Amino acid sequence: MKKRTRCLLLVFLFCLVLCVGAAAAEQTGAQLSYVTDAAGLLSENENMLLEKMAESVSQKYGVGVYIVTVEDYRDFHSEGVYKATYTIYHECTMGEGPNRDGIMLLLSIDDRDWAMFCYGSRCEYAFNSYGQEKLEKVFLDNFGANDWD
């Protein structure tokens, strides 16, 4: 992944900081890190920076913020990238607090596809459909076909 997409991921996290307005809650023990780069797009430093930012936002507001990159979402669910995101979120016990509130961005590199999944009342309050549309506008144009560089 080149600078442009890395910057977009940072902008995504920054937008989450501005949008989330819930109180802090205890973490439920997700089986994945806040940033899971299975596709190998990020350098070690970039991964650590994004991880720290996501962890800070998640703990401060009680809404888990996750970025997951995979080679192919079909490895997790064959019926679509959104269902793959849903599956990863639930199978890996992601989310903050007793209700597992969180938002997850999944990037599937092989087919240049992505999905955003929002779970829990805190997340749904902070990221209603209007908020999600606004957030998507920050990065969606750049995640189109062949615009990952």
PLM-predicted stretches and their roles:
Residues 1-9:
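Bacterial N-terminal signal peptides that target proteins for export
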Residues 5-6, 19-22:
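Intrinsically disordered low-complexity regions specifically enriched for long asparagine
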Residues 10-19:
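Bacterial N-terminal signal peptides
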Residues 23-149:
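Folded, non-transmembrane soluble domains that reside on the lumenal/extracytoplasmic side of membranes
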